[in-house]
Amino acid sequence: MNEERLTKVILAPVISEKSTLVGEKHNQVIFKILSDADKREVKQAVELLFDVKVTKVHTALVKGKRKRSGRYIGRRSNWKKAYVALQEGYEIDFASVE
């Protein structure tokens, strides 16, 4: 797989209450990813960028919500997220990652 493509697959970590609970309980990390990325690309990208071993990847499409601004109704974009399960003994600390 092209390394340039792998560096662009992961857009951002998802930091929320649910993601911290999943991280503590199941040793998983949640990322916002490109909408056309597949599980294989996500696994390779995480292993390349964070130097960890990945055991499993689950992906989910998140539907954009309808939002209102005054009398105008708009819609947020759909996006894709990946639940990445790390091997025992590995972890990703976003506070120390540059």
Swiss-Prot record:
Top-rank taxon: Bacteria
GO CC terms, sorted: ribonucleoprotein complex; ribosome
GO molecular function, one term: rRNA binding
Protein family (similarity comment): Belongs to the universal ribosomal protein uL23 family.
Subunit structure comment from the entry: Part of the 50S ribosomal subunit. Contacts protein L29, and trigger factor when it is bound to the ribosome.
Record's function text: One of the early assembly proteins it binds 23S rRNA. One of the proteins that surrounds the polypeptide exit tunnel on the outside of the ribosome. Forms the main docking site for trigger factor binding to the ribosome.
Protein known as: Large ribosomal subunit protein uL23
Organism, scientific name: Nitrosococcus oceani (strain ATCC 19707 / BCRC 17464 / JCM 30415 / NCIMB 11848 / C-107)
Lineage: Bacteria, Pseudomonadati, Pseudomonadota, Gammaproteobacteria, Chromatiales
Gene, per the UniProt record: rplW
